[in-house]
C-alpha cells in the first residue's frame, strides 16, 4: 500500500490558479510515490473541500466562523484562537480519515505549529520545508505576513526556534537556508536539502504565443522581462529606476512586467506621470504559465533581482539573467557566465549590464545556453523528485519505528 502525506500550506486554491501555479499541486505525489496527498490551506476566505482527482484533495479552512469578524477588530481577535483549534481539529480528522503517515508544513511559523501540534497528538512524524530567507524578506518588506505571528516578527522568531528543532526532518530548498536552520537549533542529521524541482519539458517545445503580437509590441523592440509579484521584496522600485536610466541611454527596449501585487497601483501612478517610464515599461498583469514561459523565451534578458521558482524558469528559457547577489541567486547566476550577479541595490550596475547584453547578442546567447544547461542539471523535476522521495522514505521509516 502506498503511503499518504498531508501538506499544510499558507495559500488558497484560487490564488494558486490566479498565479498559474496550481498545476504544481499534482507534483506532490512524486510520480506516484504517494497514494494519497491531502493539502490543508488553513487561512482562507471560506471553508470548502476541493477534490482534484483520486489522489489529490484540498481542504480550505475559512476564517468565517464568527459573522462580521472582518469588520470588527474585537471579533477578529476573538476568532484567532478559535480558528487555530478549528484548524487543528479539522487536520486531526483528515489524518485519521485518510490514515496519513506524516505531515509536511511549508513554513516554520503557523504551518509548523499546526504540523507540530497534530503530529504529536496523532503520534506521527512531521517535517518542515523552508522555501525562503524570511529574515531577508522581512527586511525588504515589513508587511509580509508569513514571517509574523500576531503581527510580531519577534514572536515569529521565537516560534521558529521552538518548532524547527522538534521536527523529524527540516528540508530547506538550498544550502544557505540549511545554514540558517542549523543556527535555529536544528541538528545537522535532521537537515535535508530538497532543491526546487520544475517540469522543464516545455522548454524543449516550440513557443505557443507570439509575444509581440499578443501584447501589440513593435517587432524592433528588445524585450526585457520581469515575471513575479509586484512587491517591495522583489525590488520593483529598482526596476522603475533601471528603466528610467536605461531609457536615457537607448530607445530600443521594453520592460514587460508580468504579475500583480500590492505595488501595482503605485507603479501605475508612476508610469502615468513619467514619459520615459511610460515608453519603456508595460504592465501585463497576471498571465498564464505558457505566456510567461514564452515571454521569457522572447526576451533578450530576464530581470530577476529577487526570485525563487522564477529564476529557474528564467534560466531554463536560455536567456541571460541579471540578479542581485542575495539569497540563493549565486547558485544559478554565475557572473559573466550565465548572466550578471550584482551587489544588492546596484542599479547603475544593472543598467550597465543590460546595456552590454543588448549590444552583444552573440555573447548574450552563449550565456543563455549555459543558464539553460545549469537549470536542467540542478532543477529538472525527475532529479529533484528522487531527492524528495529519499527524504520521505527516511521519515516514513521513523514513523514505523515511532
Describe the function of each predicted region.
Residues 1-51, 400:
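N-terminal subdomain of nucleotide-sugar transferases
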Residues 6-8, 218-234, 239-243, 256:
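Conserved donor-binding/catalytic core segment of Leloir-type glycosyltransferases
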Residues 204-217, 387:
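A short helix/loop element that forms part of the nucleotide-sugar donor recognition site in Leloir-type
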Residues 265-290:
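Nucleotide-activated donor-binding/catalytic signature segment of Leloir-type glycosyltransferases, i.e.
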Residues 320-323, 327-328, 333:
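Short hydrophobic beta-strand element within catalytic cores of glycosyltransferases
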Amino acid at each position: 500500500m502506498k503511503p499518504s502525506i498531508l501538506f499544510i500550506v499558507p495559500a488558497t486554491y484560487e490564488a494558486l490558479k490566479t498565479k498559474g501555479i496550481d498545476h504544481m499541486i499534482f507534483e506532490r505525489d512524486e510520480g506516484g510515490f504517494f497514494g494519497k496527498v491531502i493539502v490543508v490551506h488553513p487561512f482562507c476566505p471560506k471553508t470548502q473541500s476541493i477534490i482534484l482527482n483520486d489522489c489529490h484533495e484540498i481542504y480550505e479552512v475559512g476564517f468565517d466562523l464568527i459573522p462580521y469578524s472582518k469588520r470588527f477588530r474585537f471579533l477578529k481577535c476573538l476568532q484567532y484562537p478559535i480558528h487555530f483549534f478549528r484548524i487543528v481539529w479539522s487536520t486531526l480528522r483528515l489524518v485519521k480519515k485518510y490514515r496519513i503517515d506524516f505531515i509536511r508544513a511549508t513554513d516554520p511559523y503557523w504551518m509548523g505549529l499546526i504540523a507540530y501540534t497534530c503530529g504529536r497528538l496523532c503520534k506521527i512524524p512531521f517535517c518542515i520545508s523552508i522555501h525562503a530567507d524570511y529574515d531577508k524578506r522581512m527586511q525588504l518588506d515589513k508587511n509580509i505576513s508569513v514571517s509574523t505571528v500576531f503581527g510580531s516578527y519577534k514572536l515569529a522568531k521565537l516560534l521558529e526556534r521552538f518548532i524547527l528543532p522538534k521536527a523529524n526532518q527540516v528540508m530547506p530548498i538550498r544550502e544557505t537556508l540549511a545554514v540558517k536552520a542549523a543556527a535555529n537549533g536544528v541538528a545537522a542529521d535532521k537537515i535535508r536539502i530538497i532543491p526546487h524541482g520544475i517540469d522543464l519539458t516545455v522548454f524543449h517545445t516550440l513557443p505557443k504565443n507570439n509575444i509581440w503580437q499578443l501584447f501589440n509590441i513593435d517587432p524592433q523592440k528588445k524585450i526585457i522581462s520581469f515575471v513575479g509579484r509586484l512587491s517591495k521584496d522583489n525590488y520593483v522600485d529598482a526596476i522603475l529606476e533601471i528603466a528610467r536610466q536605461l531609457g536615457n541611454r537607448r530607445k530600443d527596449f521594453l520592460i514587460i512586467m508580468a504579475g500583480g501585487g500590492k505595488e501595482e497601483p503605485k507603479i501605475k501612478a508612476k508610469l502615468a506621470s513619467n514619459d520615459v517610464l511610460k515608453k519603456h515599461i508595460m504592465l501585463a498583469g497576471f498571465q498564464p504559465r505558457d505566456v510567461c514561459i514564452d515571454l521569457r523565451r522572447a526576451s533578450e534578458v530576464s530581470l530577476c533581482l529577487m526570485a525563487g521558482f522564477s529564476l529557474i524558469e528564467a534560466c531554463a528559457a536560455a536567456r541571460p539573467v541579471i540578479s542581485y547577489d542575495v539569497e540563493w541567486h549565486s547558485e544559478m547566476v554565475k557572473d559573466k557566465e550565465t548572466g550578471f550577479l550584482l551587489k544588492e541595490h546596484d542599479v547603475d550596475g544593472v543598467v550597465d549590464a543590460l546595456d552590454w547584453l543588448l549590444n552583444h547578442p552573440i555573447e548574450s546567447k552563449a550565456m543563455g545556453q549555459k543558464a539553460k544547461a545549469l537549470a536542467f542539471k540542478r532543477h529538472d523535476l525527475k532529479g529533484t523528485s528522487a531527492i524528495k522521495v529519499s527524504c520521505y522514505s527516511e521519515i516514513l521509516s521513523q514513523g514505523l519505528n515511532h
